[in-house]
Amino acid sequence: LGDVYKRQALFNLEQGGHIYSRISNPTVQVLEERVAALEGGTAALATASGMSAIFLAIMTLCNTGDHVVVSSQLYGGTVNLFRLTLPKFGIKATFVKPRDTEGFKKAIQENTKCIFGELVGNPGNELMNMPEIVKIANEAGIPVIIDSTYQTPYLFKPLEHGADIVVHSLTKWMAGHGSS
């Protein structure tokens, strides 16, 4: 009978634990803990894909009528998310060249909720001026989201340089094969 009461407490969200494999399970929890440790973060959330991680991060911060400032050097799927998908939710994006710090500053609006970019843009390999971008975001009181798929925490840890949220597609370099 103890198991019944334990399950009841879990489903009523009265205590933490694994309820349903699609929500959480011990294996995914280990993955999340390891990615958080590699990044030097406090927590991580595993999703089905890197694109879903980006979408979830943006949708957590934004509502209809909001705006994001985005580096123009991004993976094509991410560009399409900001150009085609997010506008369907009423979220607008302004694209700025990764080294154009004045452009980032000018692009921030009253309804801007974050700055998003890749430290090293894929496919152009243009380096984002992260110290300046973080400074601009901090002055505006908005978070910086960095897609660090290309670097992995072995090469660069965005959180140590002022990023607030880091996303990855683990099927690229983090998984060790880089074949996706």
What are these regions (language model features)?
Residues 7-55, 77-85:
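Conserved N-terminal alpha-helix of the aminotransferase class I/II PLP-enzyme fold
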